[in-house]
């Protein structure tokens, strides 16, 4: 199956699995998705993730995190889409919920959060908001 927007597919799978109270969700693997999963892990939005080799593309198994039977990820939204790219300079980087959430940014130095991009002093493409 051809997926037009792989990042939106990943975020939707995580959102749906959280709504259905699933323990984990399987996502087709790629370097970009691995980087996004790593950011979600570092920021405490997921328990962990592992890469499962299937002889082809591979699969990322993301284990979701719950707090009192409530999903830790309250909201997850794709911002920059294939039809409408959204870029932000170092001075225009968005804050999600006044700093309580994170923005995932694709920069020239790799995928990082908005906080890290501010420290590095670089802008980039705003991939998603997570809160």
From Swiss-Prot:
Keywords: Ribonucleoprotein, Ribosomal protein, RNA-binding, rRNA-binding. SUPFAM superfamilies: Ribosomal protein S8. The keyword Membrane does not apply. GO terms for biological process: translation. Transmembrane segments: none annotated. GO terms for molecular function: rRNA binding; structural constituent of ribosome. The keyword GTP-binding does not apply. GO terms for cellular component: ribonucleoprotein complex; ribosome. It comes from the Bacteria. Part of the 30S ribosomal subunit. Contacts proteins S5 and S12. NCBIfam families: PRK00136.1 (NF001109). One of the primary rRNA binding proteins, it binds directly to 16S rRNA central domain where it helps coordinate assembly of the platform of the 30S subunit. Belongs to the universal ribosomal protein uS8 family. This is Small ribosomal subunit protein uS8.
């Amino acid at each position: 199956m051809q997926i037009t927007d792989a990042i939106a597919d990943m975020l939707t799978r995580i959102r749906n699995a959280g709504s259905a109270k699933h323990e984990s969700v399987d996502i087709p693997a790629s370097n970009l998705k691995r980087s996004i999963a790593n950011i979600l892990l570092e920021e405490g939005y997921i328990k962990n993730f592992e890469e499962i080799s299937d002889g082809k593309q591979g699969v990322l198994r993301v284990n979701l995190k719950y707090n009192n039977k409530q999903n830790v990820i309250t909201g997850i939204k794709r911002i920059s889409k294939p039809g409408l790219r959204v870029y932000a300079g170092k001075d225009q980087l968005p804050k999600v919920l006044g700093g309580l959430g994170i923005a995932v940014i694709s920069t020239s130095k790799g995928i990082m959060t908005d906080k890290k991009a501010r420290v590095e002093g670089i802008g980039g493409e705003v991939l998603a908001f997570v809160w």
